[in-house]
């Protein structure tokens, strides 16, 4: 990785030219950590199902788990109702403080 900002997403600087693609069922916490150690400049979570967040299903917490060195961290939501996506984001943003959604 480099200390130079290659590009920005909003206010988030991406300092490197490798980005871990979001892959549901693959990009769990250990895999994101390994990719970060190998030079990934941005980590993306697995899909976070909005209904899991709204019903407090434990499955989403496993998919959301991360270490501070995984930052910048992007959340990706799975949902088909704008209101549910917004409600899930309002629950997770204070807790996770994602860099990108």
Stretches with model-predicted labels:
Residues 14-15:
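Non-catalytic, substrate/partner-engaging modules appended to enzymatic cores
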Residues 2-8, 23-100:
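Glycine-rich, positively charged N-terminal anion/phosphate-binding segment
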């Amino acid at each position: 990785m480099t200390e130079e900002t290659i590009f920005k997403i909003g206010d988030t600087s991406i300092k490197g030219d490798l980005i871990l693609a979001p892959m549901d069922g693959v990009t769990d916490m250990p895999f994101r950590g390994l990719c970060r150690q190998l030079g990934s400049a941005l980590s993306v979570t697995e899909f976070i199902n909005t209904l899991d967040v709204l019903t407090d299903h434990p499955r989403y917490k496993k998919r959301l788990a991360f270490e501070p060195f995984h930052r910048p961290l992007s959340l990706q939501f799975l949902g088909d109702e704008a209101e549910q996506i917004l409600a899930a984001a309002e629950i997770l943003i204070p807790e996770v403080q994602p860099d990108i959604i």
